[in-house]
């Protein structure tokens, strides 16, 4: 993720130095490449964490279904971003895949009650749904807000899990 943030900064600095407009499509491409790498890992962590809390295992077919839906969600979003399809189609298609992906996770790992699972599941679901809300915001604001969402969904979740498993934080 840090590599892609470096590319964002280079793009912004280049536009400023050359007094040319920022290439938002290029920035979106960087963002979606980053997400294509990081989101499957984040979803694996979510599934492993939730399975561990209910003494279950993560079936490969379940994880692969979640990852395929994740890539479908990203594909719809990206195609809407770069104008291959309209944004509404990108948003609706992305949210359908998002809903199915989270339904699989919910049905698989929320069958037994676990407060910790509920907290993390709903945290992920709400934060990730905010990306869809920000989808219609102007490009400059969207980059800034998605950077904040990335910070929350990547860094803070990682820190929270570390704190939980080291028993510094009990849920």
List the predicted regions and their residue ranges:
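Polytopic alpha-helical membrane-helix bundles and their juxtamembrane interface segments
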Residues: 1-33, 39-171
